[in-house]
Design a protein with these regions (language model features):
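Active-site neighborhoods and metal-handling regions in enzymes and metal-associated proteins
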Residues: 2-114
Length: 114
């Protein structure tokens, strides 16, 4: 065993990798679920509630909610917001550029996608 492997790298078992994969799949499915709701008239806060409900229905918890004081399940940026915007009641408008970051914690492992 090399010095680096002994002190810095923890190899994952096939079971751990399967759990990590499911955590990521929960995020993927969540993003697919809310994508169709990013339309004029809806708000980021509506998407956030829907995402939290779905993640919890998958026996996972929202990965960002409460992490470093984060108050939401999703981080949503609109237009001029660079990254990690908090969901608000700002109504989506035609032509908005929307970025969504989502995470889940499933059986001790995080899935994350931006």
């Amino acid at each position: 065993m090399t010095f680096l492997n002994r002190f810095m790298i923890k190899y994952k078992t096939s079971e751990e990798i399967a759990i990590m994969r499911e955590a990521a799949q929960i995020v993927s499915r969540t993003l697919g679920l809310i994508a169709k709701d990013i339309i004029p008239g809806n708000t980021p806060r509506q998407l956030d509630r829907k995402a939290e409900e779905y993640i919890r229905s998958q026996d996972a918890v929202p990965g960002f909610l409460g992490l470093y004081g984060c108050p939401s399940t999703l981080l949503i940026s609109i237009n001029e917001q660079v990254v990690h915007g908090l969901p608000t009641d700002r109504v989506f408008q035609e032509g908005d550029v929307v970025s969504v970051d989502c995470g889940s914690l499933y059986k001790g492992y995080y899935g994350d996608h931006a």
